[in-house]
A protein has these predicted regions:
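A surface-exposed partner-binding patch
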Residues: 1-77, 124-178
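Compact, glycine/acidic-enriched structural inserts
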Residues: 71-115
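Hydrophobic alpha-helical interaction segments
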Residues: 100-141
Length: 178
């Protein structure tokens, strides 16, 4: 499915859009654009499609195409590529406690990071007991892959300098990963 078809499905099926807000992916936040105007290092365009509660922006990169890379631009000046397409980006958003948690430490062999993410999920479940059921509902409705194996891809994507947002003043955003 093309990115635009996926976005249309989210907009058309209100329960999906509302549930994605709980996962900190809110299409309504795109109405006002990102906290500051950003572009790709090569001058390429970034189109905001959603935002998160911290003021961060999810942006499609480059010229219109069936599937476009997804860049995250955080409100604290951190950002970068998170996925090759919207479906993979949504799998990360839905399947992980947060992108910030998933990029908070080096991936290494992945064991320490997976342990940290499991702890974060347990904390979330204390206030949101339906977390796993809601994840399954969204994966099924949107045809999202399981997040297993996506962590390494997220870390590799975030290291790609070609997608690091640049402000209007020419300031390059900090990497998302440590």
């Amino acid at each position: 499915m093309r990115d635009q078809d996926l976005l249309r499905q989210i907009r058309d099926e209100r329960w999906i859009a509302e549930l994605l807000v709980q996962f900190d992916f809110d299409l309504r936040r795109a109405e006002n654009g990102p906290v500051e105007a950003v572009r790709l290092p090569d001058g390429g365009a970034l189109e905001m499609i959603a935002g998160d509660a911290s003021g961060g922006a999810f942006l499609l990169a480059g010229p219109p195409a069936d599937n476009r890379p997804v860049v995250y631009a955080g409100s604290e000046g951190e950002g970068g590529l998170i996925a090759a397409d919207l479906r993979t980006a949504l799998a990360l958003v839905v399947g992980l406690p947060s992108l910030h948690d998933a990029t908070s430490m080096p991936i290494g062999d992945g064991a320490a990071l997976r342990e940290w993410l499991a702890f974060a999920d347990d904390e979330i479940r204390e206030d949101w007991p339906e977390l796993d059921d809601d994840r399954a509902r969204l994966r099924d409705a949107l045809g999202l892959p399981e997040p297993a194996g996506l962590l390494a891809g997220l870390h590799a994507a975030a290291a790609d300098e070609r997608y690091r947002p640049v402000s209007e003043l020419g300031d390059v955003y900090e990497p998302m990963t440590s």
